[in-house]
Every structure is written in C-alpha cells, then in structure tokens.
C-alpha cells in the first residue's frame, strides 16, 4: 500500500492505511498495535507463503542430497524474487530472524511449519550431523536475502546470474562449516 502511494513506509500513517482499506481506526487497532505490527504480520504471512511454495516445489523435484535441497530452495526463492521485485523488497529487506522464526513457531494454525519441519527431517534423512541447525538456517537466509536483494535490485556488484555460482559455492562452504 505505501509503495503505491509513493510515500514509503516511514511516511505512511495509520490514517492512510485505514482509508485505503476502508476501515475505521478502531477496527485497525483491534488487530494491530501499530503500522509496524501490521508490516511484521504481513511479512510473516508472505514469507510463510513463499516457504510453503518452495516446500511444495521441492517435494516434486528430484533431489538426492541435503545440499541439493538447499540449492534447489535457494534457486526457487531467488527466481520468485526476480519475478516480483516488490515482493523481494518487502520480504528480503524486512525479514529478520525473529520474524522468520515466528513463521514456524508461533503456534498459529493459519501458518504452516512444513518447510521448517522438512528442513529438520531432511537433516536426519540425509544423515547430516549439524549441531546448530537453526543457526545454519539463519546464516543461509541472511546470506541469500541480502546478496540476492543487491544483485537483483541493483545489479551490484554483479547481476544475479553472474553471482549465483558464487552463492552456491558459499552455501556449500557454509554447510561444511556447520556440519561434522
């Protein structure tokens, strides 16, 4: 919404939001503490959709190792970001570890933990000994989000196509660093 008005999130007010949505302010405050709470819930919702979609695509793919699953998922997410720059800006710039973790652990039945559950199961399935699986996931998400954003949005320092082989190698080495 704030993107369409050209204001940016910082200058968008609750009044702008409720007017655009056709709500009363009281109704807004029944569901959200402030505009940041709304933004965080939207990020959680959209990230949940993204990871569920990635999980469904992964289930249909023919992969034979944990690393191949990670690379497939990485490529899937990057492809989605390349197709929808606004979605990428919204998710990649705002998806902190705390928000990401809440997607999978908030206990809200409207959110799925399929991706996270699959990730944990895949570690066992492929006999990957990772003493800190959440830290591994955090590191990969941070790397993928920040580097893909700059390469896709700004083509800096290079295009995503040029960067992708380096990202894959980096993820390979991160996986080695986190596993025994």
List the model feature ranges, each with a label.
Residues 48, 52, 99-127, 134-138:
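Amphipathic alpha-helical packing segments from all-alpha helical-bundle domains
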Residues 124-170, 178:
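Hydrophobic/aromatic-rich alpha-helical bundle segments in the mid-to-C-terminal region
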């Amino acid at each position: 919404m704030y993107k369409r008005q050209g204001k940016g999130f910082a200058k968008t007010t609750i009044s702008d939001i409720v007017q655009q949505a056709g709500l009363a302010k009281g109704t807004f405050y029944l569901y959200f503490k402030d505009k940041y709470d709304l933004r965080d819930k939207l990020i959680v919702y959209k990230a949940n959709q993204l990871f569920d979609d990635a999980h469904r695509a992964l289930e249909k793919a023919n992969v034979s190792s944990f690393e191949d699953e990670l690379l497939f998922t990485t490529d899937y997410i990057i492809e989605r970001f390349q197709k929808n720059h606004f979605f990428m800006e919204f998710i990649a710039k705002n998806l902190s570890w705390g928000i990401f973790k809440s997607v999978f652990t908030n206990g809200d039945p409207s959110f799925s933990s399929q991706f996270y559950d699959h990730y944990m199961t895949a570690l066992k399935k492929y006999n990957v000994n990772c003493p800190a699986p959440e830290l591994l996931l955090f590191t990969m998400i941070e790397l993928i989000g920040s580097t893909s954003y700059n390469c896709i949005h700004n083509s800096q320092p290079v295009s995503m196509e040029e960067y992708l082989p380096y990202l894959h190698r980096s993820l390979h080495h991160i996986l080695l660093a986190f596993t025994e």
